[in-house]
Amino acid sequence: LTAPDAGRGIGTEHTETFGGPGDTFRILHVSTGNVCRSPITERLTRHALADRLGHVVPGGCAEGDAIGGLIVESAGTWGHEGAPMEANAETVLADFGADPTGFVGRELLDEHVIRADLVLTATRDHRAQVISMGHSAGLRTFTLKEFTRLVRAIDPATLPPLDEGVVERARALVRAAAALRGWLL
């Protein structure tokens, strides 16, 4: 076995683990190529969060920009590293008023899963791939459809109030969704 190339595998520059103390919460969207589905869900999530939290960022939010402490990213299990978003995905985003500019495809790496507080996948196969990477990802990895269904069943009054911070509320939401898994039909 050899050590991974720089920029590959487990990163050394970021030591904070998922769900740990910190003022950011990372959402990772995963699909196959990271040129269509996951870029769409990433950018729509950023757009909705910026709208909901009242953050106006000229030119949109770039990858890694925090919106109220929330960082939204994406990667692909067979990611087209460095590839642009597909044209039809850009059209979908434009139709919803979201910014498609500046996107660059990424291959899913261990460090992405390690740093993510919430992983949302396009399919159950993607979820299985993320979980098989290890890193205690099972309780924070959901298909987008599954997470949506679970979140709709959570009473917002059971979550920390927004004045305690968006990040704490997001962490509590993921814990509540994980706890509901297997209980809802």
Whereabouts are the PLM-identified features?
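Conserved active-site segments centered on acidic
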Residues: 2-116, 125-128, 132, 136-139
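Bulky hydrophobic/aromatic packing residues
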Residues: 123-126, 173
